Amino acid sequence: MFKKFRAIRAGAIVGAAMFVTAPAGIAAQQPASSARPAASGASVRAATRQYRESHEAEIAREFVELLAIPDVALDTANIGRNATAVMAMLRRRGVTTRTLDGAGGPPAVYGELRSPNATRTVVFYAHYDGQPVDPSQWTGAPFTPVLRDGSLAAGAKVIPMPAAGERMRGDSRIYARSASDDKAAIIAMMSALDALRAGGIAPSVNLKFFFEGEEEAGSSHLRRVLQANTELLRADAWVFCDGPVHQSGRQQVVFGARGVMGLELTTYGPLRPLHSGHYGNWAPNPAVLMATLIASMRDDDGRILIAGFNDDVRPISAAEHTALGAIPPVDTTLRRALQLGATEAGNASLAERIMAPALNVRGIKVGGVRELAANAIPTEASASIDFRLVPNQTPEHVRQLVEAHLRSRGYHLVADTPDSATRVTHPKIVRVEWEGGYAATRAPMDIPFSRALLAAASSGAATPPLAVPMLGGSLPTSTFEQVLGVPLVVLPIANYDNNQHAANENIRVQNLWDGIELFAAVMARVGHEWKESAVP
């Protein structure tokens, strides 16, 4: 007779949970026996594939139901519905679950599951909230998921969702907000649990799950949630399931992520618009002031010119240099696909540039253009900027450096709209509004957990995943590292052309299938590989 999987809380058994309950329409299987020998990576993947091929319609249906719930972080009512739905998904798999107080923000969903004979605990992370949407930019309704027979960019058509027992084409895509970022990871985790259960394969580690509800809104309440639940979240390591695969199409194990912080700048000209003929060359133009200010912070090759900005950047280690050299080049292909005649830094590789900090101008607003253009000097100009940070840089220090740079350019800094006295006293004024942010992380690639996770992710794979030092995008990994003090590694599964954060977001179905296999292999193998990787 098979044994039970038990729920855990900070290493203590708090109740029994049968690892047998499947989604509606999927026959429940008995839990795996702890007496069985460890399954090989190849057998785990074969069992996962067999299960998935028999249940593609059921997986798609559960996924689409989750995608249909609007998930913009500031939409409190619908965020609550998402949390409830994710909890129900966990409970259907026998996972003990609860919400963690959001400290004034959206709740985090927590789950726990003990595996027989496991000696280590790993937390799997994803987020259930999504970016805001502008429905006018979407081909279809953002929260009405549709299946297309390929990429919309290539003219793909809407096709029916599969009926029970039907298979899905790997190159078809599901379009909806959060299809790739990050609900694909949630359904892939759930399906991996189902596949392991159906194959009689026990996870090699005790599993915990943490699903955040405000990642896309800056994770402003995350630190307090973690600090209030440190015992509950005690684990040996975290796996962040977010982001895209490599641009070559290969899966990747990523050992860190860049940090991020945002900034809004406003420069000021005359109190009212002035005729450019009567006052041009006399009244300061805020558009020119802003353009000059941006150019003083960043050159055409992406180099950040702010004094001291790069002083604390952590050097690339020998292991990271080796990993970067093994990443397949994609730059020529990407330049062609994106119709770029050249890229920055003398056409340096994308893999290399991701390892450096970046200053991105995400928008500029001033005056009018085309049919709205007027021959006038505008009153103000605004620029929206984001910084991508690398290890050893902190948002606090970057803020100090940026503000010192603005002052060195002769600007008086204000936090709100300047009053009359301020305007007539200071020749150059800039309003500075900082957004929340967090630092970067980069786990060492040669510690036992890093080696074990890479080995588990590679086990049984026809093409092993790439080992990548750092993700170009940002995740709040530093907050977890600072509060919980454990290593974190990222396992992305989305297609790289998923339109993340944009209209017509999508997940390629084969990426979802591959992600289920990847998560199942890691759950089933990482504990065994960890033992073999252990060093004094």
Named regions from a protein language model:
Residues 1-14, 24:
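Bacterial N-terminal signal peptides that target proteins for export
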Residues 119-208, 514:
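Active-site metal-coordination/substrate-binding segment of hydrolases
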Residues 53, 64-72, 87-96, 194, ...:
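Sec-exported extracytoplasmic/periplasmic mature domains
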Residues 62, 72-125, 129, 140, ...:
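A non-catalytic alpha/beta surface segment that caps or lines the substrate-entry region
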Residues 29-31, 37, 43, 246, ...:
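Metal-dependent amide/peptide-bond hydrolase catalytic core
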Residues 167-256, 531:
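Acidic/histidine-rich catalytic neighborhood of metal-dependent amide-processing enzymes
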Residues 29-78, 136-137, 257:
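N-terminal hydrophobic or amphipathic helices/low-complexity stretches enriched
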Residues 18-27:
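C-terminal segment of classical bacterial N-terminal signal peptides
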